[in-house]
Amino acid sequence: MEVKVGIGDYAVAKKTGIISTYGLGSCVGITLYDRLNRVGGLLHALLPESARYGGRGNPAKYVDTGLELLIKDMMKLGASPRRLEAKLFGGAHMFTNVSNENLMVGKKNVEVAKRELKKRGIRLVAEDTGGKGGRTIYLDVSTGKVRMRKVSNGKVIEAVF
């Protein structure tokens, strides 16, 4: 069974299934996985920090508060925060004519994701971030592997992390 995660959303599962998200541009997709209990989760975050944007609306649309929700729901399924491994995708620079640091949301999303993972003691084991193209990712909850598809310079690239 495949669960599709939209922008500003997340999903968790135990032992089986695929959790996917499409269209990661400047957004980031963060997968977390507990190998021992085979609990996985995926967050598709739109913006870096809730406080920076007034904390309005859905907390899952922000990297910092969305990650907190993801971890809590994974713990309900038996995951241990000490065993979580993270993989990070997205954070593309979608608007090449923008050079203002404050408007480079993709770069900031990646920075905040790494900071929040480190703050929680979660090891980042793989990433594919930056660039100018979108990505689609699929987390296989039975193995923890993430399959990624992206378009770069007109070519479709697939990789497994």
Swiss-Prot record:
Catalysed reactions listed for this entry: L-glutaminyl-[protein] + H2O = L-glutamyl-[protein] + NH4(+)
Domain of life: Archaea
GO molecular function, one term: protein-glutamine glutaminase activity
EC annotation from Swiss-Prot or TrEMBL: 3.5.1.44
Keywords associated with the record: Chemotaxis, Hydrolase
InterPro entries: CheD-like_sf, Chemorcpt_Glu_NH3ase_CheD, Cytotoxic_necrot_fac-like_cat
CDD domains: CheD (cd16352)
Example GO biological process: chemotaxis
Coiled-coil region list: none
Tagged with keyword rRNA-binding: no
Enzyme class, spelled out: hydrolase
Family membership noted in the UniProt record: Belongs to the CheD family.
Task of the protein: Probably deamidates glutamine residues to glutamate on methyl-accepting chemotaxis receptors (MCPs), playing an important role in chemotaxis.
Full protein name: Probable chemoreceptor glutamine deamidase CheD
Originating gene: cheD
